[in-house]
Swiss-Prot record:
UniProt GO molecular function: cytochrome-c oxidase activity; metal ion binding
InterPro entries per UniProt: Cyt_c_oxidase_su5A/6, Cyt_c_oxidase_su5A/6_sf
KW Repeat (keyword) present: no
Organism: Bos taurus (Bovine)
Keywords: Acetylation, Heme, Iron, Membrane, Metal-binding, Mitochondrion, Mitochondrion inner membrane, Phosphoprotein, Transit peptide, Ubl conjugation
Name of protein: Cytochrome c oxidase subunit 5A, mitochondrial
Pathway: Energy metabolism; oxidative phosphorylation
Pfam families: COX5A
Locus of motif SIFI-degron: 2-22
Subunit structure: Component of the cytochrome c oxidase (complex IV, CIV), a multisubunit enzyme composed of 14 subunits. The complex is composed of a catalytic core of 3 subunits MT-CO1, MT-CO2 and MT-CO3, encoded in the mitochondrial DNA, and 11 supernumerary subunits COX4I1 (or COX4I2), COX5A, COX5B, COX6A2 (or COX6A1), COX6B1 (or COX6B2), COX6C, COX7A1 (or COX7A2), COX7B, COX7C, COX8B and NDUFA4, which are encoded in the nuclear genome.
UniProt function note: Component of the cytochrome c oxidase, the last enzyme in the mitochondrial electron transport chain which drives oxidative phosphorylation. The respiratory chain contains 3 multisubunit complexes succinate dehydrogenase (complex II, CII), ubiquinol-cytochrome c oxidoreductase (cytochrome b-c1 complex, complex III, CIII) and cytochrome c oxidase (complex IV, CIV), that cooperate to transfer electrons derived from NADH and succinate to molecular oxygen, creating an electrochemical gradient over the inner membrane that drives transmembrane transport and the ATP synthase.
Amino acid sequence: MLGAAVRRCSVAAAAVARASPRGLLHPTPAPGQAAAVQSLRCYSHGSHETDEEFDARWVTYFNKPDIDAWELRKGMNTLVGYDLVPEPKIIDAALRACRRLNDFASAVRILEVVKDKAGPHKEIYPYVIQELRPTLNELGISTPEELGLDKV
């Protein structure tokens, strides 16, 4: 998609340069050509995703019944790359995907990542654990603190 936009821009620029009597080095478009070039500028005016749409997209991703271990890790890696702490409902879906895959290590790692992403905001991680406690109990997942991993 980006490649097509770049090609359109370069084709438009080449058309203006060919139309110029001075060639490529000093294009001087005619008065009517400036408006044509201006309408072909390559800006990104895509729609912005709301928080609810973002959450729904990730919950849907982790709720895929045929998700495999690689997709789980890729999704978590992408999610961790964002400048945010994932909502508990996203983490819940990721933990359930771990359970479907019988991947206890990834489940604990997800909780470690959430704690790390919370950074200096010490109230975020306890809130997330409080919200996830029913899911953790249902799935039999221990927190890193319960496993003693916070002492290492």
